């Protein structure tokens, strides 16, 4: 699936291994991996950053193959999951940065247009997360309070 507001089709993606068992060379236990995940989350890292950290520094290719559950599910079990889903959080962060830019550069028409696209993505994603009950039904994106959500 391609990016929402672009021309490309976006066909390339990484191939997941067929075997869902942990690699034979990996000697880390599931409890140790969960402990690493909770430590990283307490430091304030997002689930995707935790996955990159485990892959690059500890050599754990897939958390699900080792522990049996994904990073976000482990964080929810320990009460460390972010209140706003990660992709929505970063879209809000981008919208806040564009608004800050537009305060300094009022005539930047391209940024105004990009802000409209980003905010439409935010509204669409928020609608999806309300439907799947990952956000409360009363949650609403407002540009005036967005900077407090990201801070």
Curated annotation (Swiss-Prot):
One of its GO terms (cellular component) is nucleolus. GO terms for molecular function: small ribosomal subunit rRNA binding; structural constituent of ribosome. CDD domains: Ribosomal_S15p_S13e. It comes from the Eukaryota. The keyword Phosphoprotein does not apply. Keywords: Ribonucleoprotein, Ribosomal protein. One of its GO terms (biological process) is translation. PROSITE patterns: RIBOSOMAL_S15 (PS00362). Belongs to the universal ribosomal protein uS15 family. PANTHER family: RIBOSOMAL PROTEIN S15P/S13E, SMALL RIBOSOMAL SUBUNIT PROTEIN US15. This is Small ribosomal subunit protein uS15. It comes from Zea mays. The gene is RPS13.
């Amino acid at each position: 699936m391609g990016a929402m507001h672009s021309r490309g089709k976006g066909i390339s993606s990484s191939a997941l291994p067929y075997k869902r068992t942990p690699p034979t060379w990996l000697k880390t236990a599931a409890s140790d991996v969960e402990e690493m995940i909770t430590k990283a989350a307490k430091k304030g890292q997002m689930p995707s950053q935790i996955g990159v950290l485990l892959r690059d520094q500890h050599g754990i290719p897939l958390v699900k193959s080792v522990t049996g559950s994904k990073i976000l599910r482990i964080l929810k079990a320990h009460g460390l999951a972010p209140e706003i889903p990660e992709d929505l959080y970063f879209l809000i962060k981008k919208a806040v940065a564009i608004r800050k830019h537009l305060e300094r550069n009022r005539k930047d028409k391209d940024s105004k247009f990009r802000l409209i696209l980003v905010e439409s993505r935010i509204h669409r994603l928020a609608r999806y997360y309300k439907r799947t009950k990952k956000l409360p039904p009363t949650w609403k994106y407002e540009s005036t309070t967005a900077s407090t959500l990201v801070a």
